[in-house]
Structures are given as structure tokens and as C-alpha cells.
Curated annotation (Swiss-Prot):
Main location class: host cell
Effect caused by changing residue 129 to L: No effect on the binding to host BCL2L11
Gene Ontology biological process: regulation of apoptotic process; symbiont-mediated suppression of host apoptosis
Protein name: Apoptosis regulator OPG045
Organism in which the protein naturally occurs: Vaccinia virus (strain Ankara)
Reported induction: Expressed in the early phase of the viral replicative cycle.
Upper taxonomic lineage: Viruses, Varidnaviria, Bamfordvirae, Nucleocytoviricota, Pokkesviricetes
UniProt-annotated location(s): Host mitochondrion outer membrane; Host cytoplasm
Pfam family, one: M11L
Length: 222
């Protein structure tokens, strides 16, 4: 599944990406947007599920709104608590993975459609990703994998399975190669003891991936 997607020259292209991207939140704010009435809203949890099937009363809509608000506030609070170093990794992952998703949107959509018709477990995905990363040491593969897995969780899996997948995949993706790439990209931090630099970077890298991909859940609250 993923191996076909990686064949679309992404590995060669992503290594050369250098582009400043404005803050995601400011880009997504539309002050002129008029919110429709609840009965006219279409909630899309994934490619095959219409959330309207589960929201039949005004109470359901209000509860969904409250649940979304509380989850978003918790996520914002988590970001505020993260160390500066972790935030810098999140920024890097956001910039590069958003670039991949935008430039290869068509290729990714094809793979998402294929994946949505398959039956697979979290461990199936992890095993396939692990094989791909063992055979390909480039940064592009890792960034493309993060982008793909994030969107896959949004489209094809329920929140519980998504959390499990993100937890497992973040450890798989944050191998020594990924830590080396992130170290080269990010500015040096002289406050980290040399003896624990690699372990620290790997831990922070996992945290950054978990946070970046965890944002997917705000689209899947159910």
C-alpha cells in the first residue's frame, strides 16, 4: 500500500523542500464564514461515514459542539506546555509534511482511496512502514509516511485505533535516521548534555510526531 505511494518521486523531491509556511491557525481562519444551522451541517468523520446518522436531535448537535470545544482546548493547552525544543520539531514537521501533502495531493488521494477498501490492522500498517523505512533511509520517505499515516487515521480509522496507530508509528518512524535529519535541520541546543543528546532527540521527536498527528482527532470526535 505505502510502497506504491513512495514510488511517485517523493523521496527525491522532499529532501530539497525549503519553504516558509504561515501559522496554520491564521491560514484557517475565515472571519466571513457564516455557520449553517445544525440541521444543514454535514459532519464527515471519514470517507464512508456520515456523522448525521448519529446526530438526530438538537441535543446531539449541542453535545458534539461541547465535546469538540473541550477537546480543542485540551490540545491547545498541551501545546502550551510543550518545551521550546519540541515546538521547534512540530514546526519542522508541519512545514515539511504539509508541503508533501499539498504537492502530492493527487497521489495521496489515490492511495487513500485504495487503503479505504482494504482490511488491515494497526500492526499490519506498522510492519509495512517498518519494512519501507529499513529499505529507504531518506528523509523524504519518513515525511511522506507521516503525512500519509496522519490522513489515513483521519479517513479510515476510529479515534481509539487512531491513537493506537499514532503511538506505535511514532516510535517506528523516529529511528536514528530521522533523528539525524531533524538534528541537521533544527538549530543546535547547547543545553542538552552530549551523553544524552540522541536519546533526548528521539524522545522529543516522538513527542512532536504524536502532537502533530494527534491533531487529526479533532476531526474525528465521536
Amino acid at each position: 500500500m505505502l510502497s506504491m505511494f513512495m514510488c511517485n518521486n517523493i523521496v527525491d523531491y522532499v529532501d530539497g523542500i525549503v519553504q516558509d509556511i504561515e501559522d496554520e491557525a491564521s491560514n484557517n481562519v475565515d472571519h466571513d464564514y457564516v455557520y449553517p444551522l445544525p440541521e444543514n451541517m454535514v459532519y464527515r468523520f471519514d470517507k464512508s461515514t456520515n456523522i448525521l446518522d448519529y446526530l438526530s436531535t438538537e441535543r446531539d448537535h449541542v453535545m458534539m459542539a461541547v465535546r469538540y470545544y473541550m477537546s480543542k482546548q485540551r490540545l491547545d493547552d498541551l501545546y502550551r506546555q510543550l518545551p521550546t525544543k519540541t515546538r521547534s520539531y512540530i514546526d519542522i514537521i508541519n512545514i515539511y509534511c504539509d508541503k508533501v501533502s499539498n504537492d502530492y495531493n493527487r497521489d495521496m488521494n489515490i492511495m487513500y482511496d485504495m487503503a479505504s477498501t482494504k482490511s488491515f490492522t494497526v500492526y499490519d500498517i506498522n510492519n509495512e512502514v517498518n519494512t519501507i523505512l529499513m529499505d529507504n533511509k531518506g528523509l523524504g520517505v519518513r515525511l511522506a509516511t507521516i503525512s500519509f499515516i496522519t490522513e489515513l487515521g483521519r479517513r479510515c480509522m476510529n479515534p481509539v485505533k487512531t491513537i493506537k496507530m499514532f503511538t506505535l508509528l511514532s516510535h517506528t518512524i523516529c529511528d536514528d535516521c530521522f533523528v539525524d535529519y531533524i538534528t541537521d535541520i533544527s538549530p543546535p541546543d547547547n543545553t542538552i548534555p552530549n551523553t544524552s543528546t540522541r536519546e533526548y532527540l528521539k524522545l522529543i521527536g516522538i513527542t512532536a510526531i504524536m502532537f502533530a498527528t494527534y491533531k487529526t482527532l479533532k476531526y474525528m470526535i465521536g
